[in-house]
Amino acid sequence: MTSDSIPARDTKPQVSCRYAEQVLSCYAQRVDRLIERRPAKLVTIFCDGSSLGNGRDAARAAAVALLGFKGLWRAFGTYLGQATNQQAEIAAAALGLEALKEPCRVSLHTDSKYVVETMSGRYRRKTNHDWWKRLDEAAGRHQVEWRWAQGHVGHVIQEAADKAARKIAALGHVEPSVLQDAVDKIGVIEPEEADEEQLF
């Protein structure tokens, strides 16, 4: 065999697909560990539910959640239609937690002892199982501290949530201006105080 019949050697380094997959997997695991070590951000939620005509066929219910993070406040609301006051309170807590785009540490304030005591494991769940399931799923990815806030005692944020929930229930739909009014009642937030990351 002559030398010119020998195929030329490929001088490029050969890397097996298996090795490349192992390297990528290793880096992915390191990134996951770094993410796990990063402390979750602390978010404050004030929520309230309202049912006008509670317990009657013509009841009109709504839920509102006010979320605060580093000076930035946003309001979320939903019209529930025919629902009880307890169901509206559960929905309000779920609404706030569902609005978060990443796992967070959450200080959740509600004037519903029913929600606080049930989610803390002190009350048994006898009714509203579908509503509790929604709240369980919403809370599952967060570290939630359930805090009772006495209603109708002049707490600015809790009162803003309460008023917005009652207004939406009366209107029968979510009006953006109602949610904006709730945020405005909390106070003016300067742009430099707000965090640039969009958590909600």
Where on the chain are the PLM-derived regions?
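RNase H catalytic domain
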Residues: 43-44, 49-57, 93-162, 169
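RNase H-like nuclease fold core
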Residues: 24-87, 98-99, 104, 171-174, ...
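Loop-to-helix element that buttresses phosphate recognition and phosphoryl-transfer chemistry
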Residues: 88-92
